[in-house]
């Protein structure tokens, strides 16, 4: 996926109220833009750090742009716009990049399912039945490590999705959780036990129930982003 329009660059001043960020563009313009990420963004919001944003020409929008990419203190690029992950995964699915999930005959997004009234990111149809696929965007990395972690903040919603997938798996329905790692320089991903032990426990229970766990990494520049490789998943035993 190519970023269109082309991203503009600036420096982060501050992120606040979770969904807002003040930046200074390279031309010296001061802007308040939308932050499309509900997490803590622990390694992605250093004041003075480089950021890239998309600018909107829609006069009905309250904010002129959307924060898309951060440069982390480790010099990595992270796509912090969590809404991009599902688009990337759909592109990869249709291109056959995710080898474990090829052969489907139909794809639907945001399908209602489950006892807790969730909406799954993708429902893939195969000749022998449905596959339910939940996607999580990963951007949390650490100094000196090529292993990313999820989540970067406590996520009750993430644990609920795992419970829903586990219920399907126990009923004999194929259920998959895919970590879409939108952070450069990463070889593997793990559950962030130290941040959300309840999520890590729910992940282990989902695996025991038969949920399949996958991780794929994205190639990322300020011009384009696309999924290009499978990653290892650590900490599942």
From Swiss-Prot:
Signal peptide: none annotated. Belongs to the SfsA family. This is Sugar fermentation stimulation protein homolog. It holds the Pfam family SfsA. It comes from Pseudomonas syringae pv. syringae (strain B728a). Gene3D superfamilies: 2.40.50.580, 3.40.1350.60. InterPro entries: SfsA (IPR005224), SfsA_C (IPR040452), SfsA_N (IPR041465). GO terms for molecular function: DNA binding.
């Amino acid at each position: 996926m190519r970023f269109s329009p082309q991203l503009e660059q600036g420096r982060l001043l501050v992120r606040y109220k979770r969904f807002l960020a003040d930046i200074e563009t390279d031309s010296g313009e001061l802007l308040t833009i939308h932050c499309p990420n509900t997490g803590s963004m622990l390694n992605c919001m250093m004041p003075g750090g480089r950021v890239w944003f998309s600018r909107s020409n829609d006069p009905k929008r309250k904010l002129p742009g959307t924060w898309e990419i951060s440069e982390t203190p480790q010099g990595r690029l992270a796509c912090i716009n969590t809404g991009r992950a599902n688009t990337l995964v759909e592109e990869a699915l249709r291109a056959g990049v995710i080898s474990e999930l090829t052969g489907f005959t139909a794809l639907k997004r945001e399908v209602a399912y489950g006892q807790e009234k969730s909406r799954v990111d993708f429902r893939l149809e195969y000749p022998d039945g449905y596959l339910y696929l939940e996607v999580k965007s990963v951007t949390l990395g650490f100094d000196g490590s090529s292993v990313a972690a999820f989540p970067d903040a406590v996520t009750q919603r993430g644990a609920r999705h795992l419970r829903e997938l586990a219920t399907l798996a126990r009923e004999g329905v194929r259920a998959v959780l895919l970590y879409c790692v939108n952070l450069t320089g990463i070889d593997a991903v793990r559950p962030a036990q130290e941040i959300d032990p309840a999520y890590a426990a729910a992940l282990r229970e989902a695996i025991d129930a038969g949920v399949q766990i996958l991780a794929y990494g994205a190639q990322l520049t300020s011009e384009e982003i696309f999924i290009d490789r499978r990653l290892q998943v650590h900490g599942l035993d």
